[in-house]
Each structure stands twice: as C-alpha cells, then as structure tokens.
C-alpha cells in the first residue's frame, strides 16, 4: 500500500518545512535502548513473531470510552501556512469534532496519532478525515495490526514515523508486507 516507516525518532532529529522546523528534543538514545530491550524480551516471549496475516484482520472499531482520554488536549502548531496536529490521548470522535470545528478543510504537515496508535482511538473515519501524508506514532509496543490495516485501506502513500522498529521483527507475514 506504499506506507513507509522511519525509526528511531530520537533527540536531534529535525523536520523542516518552509522556514519552520520541528526539532525532536527527546527521547535520548540510551532511554530508547532500555525500552527496546524490554520490547525484544516481549517478542522473545511471544516466539519472536506476531502470527496472523494483516489481510485477515477483523476490523471491528470499539471507541475509547475513557473520560480522561476524552479530556486529553488536542493542539495545532502553526507556523506560516503550515500546521501540525497533536492529538494527545484523545478519542477519534473528539478529534474529528475538533478538526471539523476549527480546521475543516486543512491539510496538516504532520499528525501525531492519539494514544500510542490504539485501535480504540483511531477509526477509519479519523484516518479519512486527517488530511496529511505523515503520521507520528509514539509507542513502546507494537502497533495493533488492525490500525495498520485501516491505514492500508483508507490511505495511499502514507509515511508513519515511529520511535521503535517493531515492524522489522517478523511482525508481518510475507503477504502482510504487500
């Protein structure tokens, strides 16, 4: 589906756009390595791979019902004519409502996806609504395959920026990579 991934995203990484920039100031490489070791152990415990083909994922969306997540901050960084959407741990429904109210037709430079890429916070409707080609997922676990399935079905030529290389560890079957 032509979705590329970049990792790790560490302090010192910069993204520039028309006179503006985003500079990543954390996490430090050492912190990332500690967490990466934990992830590696989790993967070893699970046999080192995630069985199941992404093309056979059952896509049943169950919305996040947490009041604290519903109250999570949704913010937009604006510089000149560029905008980056930060969604915190908010719900898909709240993000769609906020974007419809304040930025109904806006193209964002990037969107930081909510709640570590949780399938309960990322619906197909949200993926369709967010007008961008670059999404950030920050998580210390593997992203649920159903979220990647939703992206594959709803978006083309999308770049997912991740802080870990979880997908390189036999996460996909050969068919799932296609």
What are these regions (language model features)?
Residues 1-83, 158-159, 175-178:
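Flexible, acidic/histidine-containing loops and adjacent segments that form or flank the divalent-metal
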């Amino acid at each position: 589906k032509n979705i590329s991934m970049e990792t790790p995203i560490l302090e010192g990484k910069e993204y520039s756009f028309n006179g503006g920039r985003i500079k990543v100031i954390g996490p430090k490489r050492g912190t990332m390595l500690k967490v990466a070791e934990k992830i590696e152990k989790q993967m070893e415990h699970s046999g080192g791979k995630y069985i199941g083909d992404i093309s056979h994922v059952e896509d049943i969306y169950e919305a996040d019902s947490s009041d604290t997540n519903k109250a999570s901050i949704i913010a937009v960084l604006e510089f000149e004519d560029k905008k980056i959407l930060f969604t915190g741990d908010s719900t898909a429904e709240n993000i769609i409502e906020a974007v419809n109210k304040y930025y109904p037709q806006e193209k964002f430079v990037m969107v930081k996806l909510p709640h570590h890429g949780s399938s309960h916070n990322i619906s197909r409707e949200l993926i369709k609504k967010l007008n961008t080609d670059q999404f950030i997922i920050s998580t210390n676990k593997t992203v649920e395959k159903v979220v990647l399935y939703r992206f594959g079905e709803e978006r083309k030529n999308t770049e997912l920026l991740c802080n870990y290389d979880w997908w390189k560890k036999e996460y996909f079957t050969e068919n799932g990579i296609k």
